[in-house]
Amino acid sequence: MSHQSELIETDIDAYLAQHERKELLRFLTCGSVDDGKSTLIGRLLHDSKMIYEDQLAAVASDTTKHGTTGEKIDLALLVDGLQAEREQGITIDVAYRYFSTAKRKFIIADTPGHEQYTRNMATGASTCDLAVILIDARYGVQTQTRRHSYIASLLGIKHVVVAINKMDLVEFSESRFEEIKQSYLDLSKSLNPAELHFVPMSALDGDNVVNISERTPWYSGKSLMQILETVEIASDKNADDFRFPVQFVNRPNLNFRGFCGTVASGVVKVGDKVKALPSGKTSTVKSIVTFDGELDEAFVGQAVTLTLADEIDISRGDMVVLADSEQTLSNRLRAHLVWMSEAELKPGKQYLFKFASKVTPGVVADIEYRVDVNTFEKSEESAMQLNDIAVVDVQLEQEVVVDAYQKNRATGAFIVIDRLTNITVGAGMAIEALASAAATKGDYSEFEVELNALVRKHFPHWDAKKIG
């Protein structure tokens, strides 16, 4: 099946060890409706020899029922897994696929192109390192191209590959490729991606997807797969500012007290002097414990347990940073917010805000402006609707550690949770922390006020505070 099938058959331990050492690249495909996103992923899997024979046979059978490619196998059916997607020939939900080559491991997020699924795309893009934006060579840059480029930029994706697809339908015209390239360059001036690539391709026939095509002799660049295998992403991670959100306090016996979590950014070493926020108490890292034994240092992405030389008060939701860090606490911040609920957002309504492992009540105090993701124009709004993106002022009841999202994606992101249904209704990216303000109580629902009164009446020993 794959490039490593022989190694799997002869030495599974060697294969697993080699696979574990490979660097992981997460990327998403996005573009206008029917630009060929799912077909491109199917082509990547097919040409990388990552499809089993029975899968290929099933797709060949489904092509006669749902396919849109005539006599050719519709590789998009490898990815469009929902029955509604196959019947409509579109992508609705974010579809994830996993594959690897000799050089890297990959997780692909195939995101929907329709405007009503903007929230789905934002979800898929939030963990990606690279975006593949497809453009139909016949139509050029479309409204949805602008929207997806803006969302990719907003969510901190630094590497963008503009895949100008269906070049076979314009006879692999170099002038058409250059025209679309210039049009996108004009668009990207306001988005400032760190790295931008352009590839002419035909996902249906495989031109410049995995292998360089003979039908584009005028193109001297890399194929899409070559770009995916070689793009430099290690430097994208914040290795300077140590951030460790505490997820769990591990106390199996009286002789051990460790703080479990995943290093969000930076590096920590045994002997480093650290500080716990919000308390501000300091101590020294005594040991770094993992399932496989103790480490001398831990870096971004590693799940570890820290033990400290001193008994200081740390609980779930606290943040451990280096002692000399100038990180400040704030209960007020300015942020981009993607609204994901059918119920509109009005300033002043109480929600829960989750930053890493920290959860605190708060409100959106003000909507500064809404961004039209199709034109990039700004407008004043009194409420946010489903799929809206706006810059807002958030006020929290407790102070939190937050970094600018563009500087640190792990500690600059947050989600908004409905207090009654526990459903995630928004995703936020911090722009900057503002000076702390007096904690705001927000607007409570009639049910919350009545429940609070009931608790205070019948359970006075709980010391519940009056609300509303």
From Swiss-Prot:
InterPro entries registered for this protein in UniProt: CysN_GTP-bd (IPR041757), CysN_II (IPR044138), CysN_NoDQ_III (IPR044139), EFTu-like_2 (IPR004161), G_TR_CS (IPR031157), GTP-eEF1A_C (IPR054696), P-loop_NTPase (IPR027417), Small_GTP-bd (IPR005225)
Stretches for region G5: 202-204
Catalytic reaction annotation: sulfate + ATP + H(+) = adenosine 5'-phosphosulfate + diphosphate
GO biological process entries: hydrogen sulfide biosynthetic process; sulfate assimilation
Keywords for the protein's UniProt record, in alphabetical order: ATP-binding, GTP-binding, Nucleotide-binding, Nucleotidyltransferase, Transferase
Metabolic or biological pathway: Sulfur metabolism; hydrogen sulfide biosynthesis; sulfite from sulfate: step 1/3
Positions of the tr-type G domain: 22-239
Gene Ontology MF: a single term: ATP binding
Quaternary structure and interacting proteins, as annotated: Heterodimer composed of CysD, the smaller subunit, and CysN.
Name of the protein in its database record: Sulfate adenylyltransferase subunit 1
Protein EC: 2.7.7.4
Purpose of the protein: With CysD forms the ATP sulfurylase (ATPS) that catalyzes the adenylation of sulfate producing adenosine 5'-phosphosulfate (APS) and diphosphate, the first enzymatic step in sulfur assimilation pathway. APS synthesis involves the formation of a high-energy phosphoric-sulfuric acid anhydride bond driven by GTP hydrolysis by CysN coupled to ATP hydrolysis by CysD.
Chain spans, region G4: 165-168
Region (G2) location: 89-93
Residue ranges of the region described as G3: 110-113
Chain segments carrying region G1: 31-38
Protein family membership: Belongs to the TRAFAC class translation factor GTPase superfamily. Classic translation factor GTPase family. CysN/NodQ subfamily.
Chain sites annotated for binding GTP: 31-38, 110-114, 165-168
Organism field: Teredinibacter turnerae (strain ATCC 39867 / T7901)
